[in-house]
Amino acid sequence: MKTLSCGILVLSILFGSVTSAQQFKSDVSKKGTTAASFLSISQGARAAAMGSAFVAVADDWSAMYWNPAGIATTPNGVTFDHTQWFADIGYNFVAGSVNLGSIGAIGMSLTSSTIGDMKVTTVNAPDGTGEVFNMSQVAFSVAYAIQLTDNFAIGFNPKFVYERIWKMSANAMAIDMGVKYRTPFDGIVLGMSISNFGQKMRMTGQNAVVLYDADPASSANNGRVPAEMSTGDWALPLNFRVGLAYQPSLGDMHRLVLAVDAMHPSDDYESVNVGGEYTFDGFLSFRGGYKALFLKESEESFSLGFGIRQQIMGHLSLSADYCYVNFGRLNDIQKISVSMGF
């Protein structure tokens, strides 16, 4: 009873934090009004193939993205995930965690972008000035999670977020928080998380420096005073997730996981993700799902994937996962993950 009360208190704090930080009308989506939008890209081919319905599953190293409480019961290991995004943009995600027993588990993750050079164009040189520029996006986090009881875990994932485009950059600190609760109902797990709760970002740098003439009508003043243009503050893409996962008892040869997540983001309408995974003999898995149910004008829809896992020796295991995500009129997305448990 005490554990349940603790869980309810934590969940109430999480929900209260996100709702107080997200006061907007339901008829306004606020799409495109946040910085560091790469933080909203699903990480982990397995999770993405399940329609991104993973907050209550969160049982591999990508849990640091979905629900940091998940690493409390995840074995030691690392994962590498590559996402081939639109316009030849790629995103890499590396995460790993170590279980320290009764004192909890710690983990680290790094998300980075791979974006090629682009031409610098101006009004007078629409075909390019001869210069090129690029951009980079990075998020680094250190997570901690602990299993407070056999049925309840909580996790925290502080992170540093950085974006740069040409000679301008911005950074911010943020945190993800999550809980997992194994309910009294056989095979049902409840998960909740809040992601990217933190500072706003503001672009600063050399491109904002200009030469200013305070009195252009006068010839006696200095018309080349160095000045810096002011830029605005932009919030991170705050997101609240709550979900259920159900794993029926099918014996040792077969494993089935069904999951559903509801999302309340700060820069879009609410939506629902659903997905499932079937695994045969702990070796071969097939996955499918649908993301953004009930979301207006969403291009992202169904996802499919598969994975293989091989136990090498003792606790050492290797796994590889693939995911395909349909994006409607946009280019479809593909993800590949490689993981090692030890």
Regions found by a protein language model. Give the residues of each.
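Positively charged n-region of N-terminal signal peptides that target proteins for export
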Residues: 1-7
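Outer-membrane beta-barrel porins/channels
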Residues: 22-48, 90-342
